[in-house]
Structures are given as structure tokens and as C-alpha cells.
Amino acid sequence: MTALNHTPLNAAHRALNARMVDFGGWDMPVNYGSQIEEHEAVRTDAGMFDVSHMCVVDFTGSRVRAFFEHAIANNVGKLKTPGKALYSCLLNPQGGVIDDLIVYYFTEEFFRVVVNAGTAEKDIAWFNQLNEQGGFGVTITPRRDFAIVAVQGPNAREKAWSTVPAARAATSELKPFNAAQVAGTPFGDLTVARTGYTGEDGFEVIVPAVHVEALWNALQQNGVRPCGLGARDTLRLEAGMNLYGQDMDDTVSPLDAGLAWTVDLTAPRDFVGRAALEANGTRAAFVGLILQKENGKAGGVLRAHQKVVTPHGEGEITSGTFSPSMQESIAFARVPAAVQIGDLVQVQIRDKNLPARVVKLPFVRNGKVLAA
């Protein structure tokens, strides 16, 4: 049996009596006692997540921009100011999603990318292959010397500033999907990004691994609640945010995973997967579902891989959960393209077909329920 990977915060999680699970080969906390309370902390105050299993990768060289114009589906031409971030898919030639990632632009010769844990080695190998084939001459450096802490919630930024006062000046005017580099803090040189995976405001902080436990402890002392993967999943699902490997993978087009907004076909770029996307177009709708109640009760919980029956053919739930914010069973589903918002469909739960309503994503954003 292969030993699990540990983040630099593993001992801190265990000291907090976290319930640990194998998450894609990483020993990670699923909760610290109450997943619901952790979820609520992020929606109403401030919570923090260890996301150090994700991998920071630095790209340097004179042709970094040209490399990303070819490598990713979104358009790095949008990255003009230092610190600007871009969410994109990394595609294979068939138009399938190898990974979803965030690209940060700092200078014309320095871009930084954060990739998912389970796909990191595959991504880096693919980047190296594209770099070599295209003769871009880019230096690609995985940075396992970094850890990442996500501080999320309506009070997250204030509590982060209380913990790292030096970050306030550099980040107080930071707009969403932008990052700043903050040098000389007690926790080393930081990259602080106004990004997240919860539907709430906050920061994702890239910190030297040797300092991350001190930062984690200081944030906790300033009232930021440690949160595990369980709350992270319910929060991201409410927020309408995809999970790689569940809502899309290398056999699924971003156009069929609710990610058409991350694909830029307007610029004349020959990016990997473009020809396949243009040839195939959109084949399915990616929608939200809310399980309908009878006599005030739902007959089950929506879960991944349940079959969705519609008048236009069958679909499948990709992610599902019970929403703490809505007190409803919610899901993402890939369904025939003719399915419309507001339609009623049937979901096969055990031996029953139960009604669910099709809604526009997201369900919740900034603490407000949007899907009724």
C-alpha cells in the first residue's frame, strides 16, 4: 500500500483532532468535528482551508505569454496588469479537460499557475511536452516549497489583515481575481490572491511551507475557524463551482461542463483542443437541480451518478449534496441540451423516480440564496 502524501499542516490537523481521509492520495482533514458548523462559519464569518495539496508551478522565460496562448483555452491576452488572475481549462487535442487551473500574471517573463493535486504530475508532464514541441524555451518549476491556505468568508479579509498587518496596504484595493506579492512578513514572502472556492470573499495565500503552521495558528488565534474538505465540498457546490474528476475530466468538453465562459474562441489563437471544440460544439446542458419536496419532505439526497430522466433523453448527476444554506438537496447534472431552466425532471434514487427542478447556477453567492 502506497503511503499517503502529507501537507506541511498534517500535524496541525491531527492536533485539532481532525477526521482524516485519503483524498486523491493525500492525508487530508474532512472535518474538525462539525462539517455543518464549518460550512456556516464560512458563510457568516471566516473559515480557513489547507489547500497545500494543490501545486504551485512557476513559468519563466521570454515567451511565457506565447506558451499560454497555445496551452490553455482561456485567453491570457486578458492578463495585462501585474497580479491579474485567469481561470482556465487545460485541454487535450480531443477537447477534453486535463485540468482546471488559475494562471497569475506578474511580469512578461513570470507567470504562476496553481493546479489540482490529483492532476499535478500529469499537468506538469503535459506542460513540458507542449513547451518542448513548440520550442517556447520556458522554464517550468514546480514549487513544493510553498503551501496554500484559503481564508474565506465575509470577515475573512479583515481577519487576515489582523493576522498579517503588512498585507493590508498591498491588498486592501485588490479586486477579485487579482493577487499581490507581500514581502517581509513574519510568515515570509507571501502571494495573496482574492480568489476562492466557496462563493464567499476572501484570500488564498501562497506561503513558504516552513512558515505555514505559524500562519495557520495565528489565523486561528484571530478567530478564523479551521474547515475541512466536507465543508469545502458543500460550499463549492452551493457556489456552482466544478470539481475536477467529478464534474469534468479528460473525456468531457468544457462546453458540456458549464465552462464555456472559460473558453475564448474570439481571439485567433491555435490553442490545444480548439479544433475539437469548434467541430463538436455544445452537446449537453450543465444545470443545477433542486429535489422537490412532498408534504415538506424530500425523498432522498441527490448524489453523483444518479440517473436523470427528461423528456429529451437521459442525463446524469455529476455532484450532489444536502445544502446547509438552503436546507434542500441540490446537484449539478449533465443533461440533454434541450432541457431548459424551470423544467421538472425525474431523478432515480434507489428504486424511485423523484422530481427535481432545473435551476440556473449558482445556488448561493456571497451568503445569498439565488436559486429558489
UniProtKB/Swiss-Prot annotation:
UniProt record, GO biological process: glycine decarboxylation via glycine cleavage system
One MF term in the entry's GO annotations: aminomethyltransferase activity
SUPFAM superfamilies according to UniProt: Aminomethyltransferase beta-barrel domain, Folate-binding domain
Protein's UniProt keywords contain Glycoprotein: no
EC code(s) of this entry: 2.1.2.10
Superkingdom field: Bacteria
Pfam short name (any one): GCV_T_C
Catalyzed chemical reaction(s): N(6)-[(R)-S(8)-aminomethyldihydrolipoyl]-L-lysyl-[protein] + (6S)-5,6,7,8-tetrahydrofolate = N(6)-[(R)-dihydrolipoyl]-L-lysyl-[protein] + (6R)-5,10-methylene-5,6,7,8-tetrahydrofolate + NH4(+)
Record's keyword annotation contains Coiled coil: no
Record's keyword terms, sorted: Aminotransferase, Transferase
GO cellular component: cytosol; glycine cleavage complex
InterPro entries xref list: GCS_T (IPR006223), GCS_T_bac (IPR022903), GCST_C (IPR013977), GCV_T_N (IPR006222), GcvT/YgfZ/DmdA (IPR028896), GcvT/YgfZ_C (IPR029043), TrmE/GcvT_dom1 (IPR027266)
Oligomer and partners: The glycine cleavage system is composed of four proteins: P, T, L and H.
Family to which the UniProt record says this protein belongs: Belongs to the GcvT family.
Protein purpose: The glycine cleavage system catalyzes the degradation of glycine.
Record's protein name: Aminomethyltransferase
